[in-house]
Amino acid sequence: PEDAPDCEAVEFLIQEALRDDPAPLYIAAQGAMTNIAAALNRAPEIASRMTVLWNGGGPYPAGRPEFNVQQDPIACRVLLDSAVTVWQIPQDVYAKFEVSLSELALRVRPCGEVGAYLFQQLMDEYPSEYDPRFPLRTGGNWTLGDNTTAAVLPVSYTHLRAHETRS
């Protein structure tokens, strides 16, 4: 559509999907599906040439509103209605991918100013009491959320191309 973002990420997705490369293209999507949907709208022929690993959707099978879906529900519909192979990781699954706060204190906080800053940002967001409406931060653990996509990337390939884009 005319309102599809014109950005580096969309162009990169299209170029990578159209590459003459026997290795499969896995896209570990984090956040909204806006750029993926825009690439599919611009070049629908890329759908069969990629697999999207996506953290999104409420608990299976009932579902409910979920942050990554709510950011751009139309883009989610474009993705799910396409021929793209989607490995969906719903909230009840990705919420189990946790790291302890003590491990973050041990491995992140001592990493200079950036590590101390990141650790403090997590602590500032950490609730002082359990909230059953927000199960992502409970007890002494922090759910890593969207990072679950990296954990399920196939590791059997000898090369993986990584590229970060921002729209």
Regions found by a protein language model. Name each.
Residues 158-165:
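Conserved small/polar residues in nucleotide/adenosyl-binding loops
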Residues 59, 156-157:
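Short Gly/Pro-enriched loop/turn and capping motifs at secondary-structure junctions
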Residues 145-156:
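Short, hydrophobic/amphipathic alpha-helical patches that form generic packing surfaces
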Residues 29, 140-143:
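Aromatic-acidic/polar surface patches that form glycan- and anion
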Residues 2-101:
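Active-site histidine-anchored catalytic micro-motif
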Residues 85-141:
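Active-site rim beta-loop-alpha module in soluble metabolic enzymes
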Residues 76, 116-119, 147:
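A general structural signal for well-ordered alpha-helical packing
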